[in-house]
Amino acid sequence: MMFTDAPLHHVGVVQPDEEQALAVMETLGLREAYRGYVPQFHALCIFTHAAQGSPVEFVIPDDGPLMKFNKGAGGLHHLAFEVPDLRALSADFERQGLRMLEPEPVNGAGPFLCNFLTPAATRGIIIEYVQPLPNG
């Protein structure tokens, strides 16, 4: 699976707290589409509406390594691409000697499974892959 085959699903931005995330949303005129909590990543995730493009996901950690992202200040965190079969993609990467952060895909903040390619494979760029769930 190449990037040319996977459309951009969303852009993830870490914010230190919900108040700051909502302030950025207000400044940019973004409206909340939905929110969810991802226990594996200790984070509340707020997705925005996307008129023509991809939504922004505001990631608000309450524990774990994301709290230290960019020295606690937050910022642009990841690009997420949509794939039809996350497990097949993970197996493909494994055959290439690459690995995902989680041993198995996890439930995302929305109706999708997700996993991240280790940043070492992309020279520090954090890439997430998401697989929409049926009826999602």
Report residues per predicted region.
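N-terminal functional modules and adjacent low-complexity/disordered segments of proteins
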Residues: 3, 23-25, 71, 81, ...
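Aromatic-residue detector
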Residues: 3, 18-21, 30-33, 54-57, ...
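Amphipathic alpha-helical segments
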Residues: 17-32, 89-97
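Residues in flexible loops and secondary-structure boundaries
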Residues: 16, 21, 38-40, 66, ...
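A cross-kingdom feature marking solvent-exposed beta-strand/loop segments within repeated
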Residues: 8-9, 28, 32-42, 63-77, ...
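Vicinal oxygen chelate
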Residues: 1-4, 7-16, 44-51, 56-57, 68-136
